[in-house]
């Protein structure tokens, strides 16, 4: 975040992709992006990742340790990929809360899971990750997949996730990160800034949202920085696993 001020009463700014915008405007701009892409979000995930997002999410679920009877919160749950799998794991004695700040994404997720008949133990909640509307010490596991980079105050969101976890509960953060290989990094940059906006234009008639996606990935904290943020928030035993040469990383932390 850029806290420089143009005057004594100027609003702090933050990044929206590569742009500096007033903090109060970022959530609105992010909402516009996801209202635009919600209907074809799943298709674009498959196109842009070559289906790899399914493997990344599967590994995240394996790391979560979720079992029957658990209570799970999936933040920025969108179209419900993780929630559907957690629903089967926790069974009829457990509960999954699919939370998303974006009404369009939440509607797509709700409709999709209801159509698949897997929403019996899933609750759908419109919620801000920075101000989660849940009791303290409530969940066995909290996940956020490809959502943290869109949050204005990431530190506040991580503290909010810690608060709602039970002692011993796990936080899993699956997010785009920094490639560990220089050659891969160069190829990924070319892919991100050429192919992603083009695919967005062809499939959703919206290149700008996918340009924002590419830029937001570059502005997100790298693996070690995010690990330090989780430790600072109060998590123990924070580790991360790189996937696809660090293009994606999953961080895990335990609430003391």
UniProtKB/Swiss-Prot annotation:
Residues 1-12 have a biased composition (Basic and acidic residues). It catalyses: a 2-demethylmenaquinol + S-adenosyl-L-methionine = a menaquinol + S-adenosyl-L-homocysteine + H(+); a 2-methoxy-6-(all-trans-polyprenyl)benzene-1,4-diol + S-adenosyl-L-methionine = a 5-methoxy-2-methyl-3-(all-trans-polyprenyl)benzene-1,4-diol + S-adenosyl-L-homocysteine + H(+). One of its GO terms (molecular function) is demethylmenaquinone methyltransferase activity. Residues 1-22 are annotated as: Disordered. GO terms for biological process: aerobic respiration; menaquinone biosynthetic process; methylation. Pfam families: Ubie_methyltran. HAMAP family: MenG_UbiE_methyltr (MF_01813). This is Ubiquinone/menaquinone biosynthesis C-methyltransferase UbiE. The gene is ubiE.
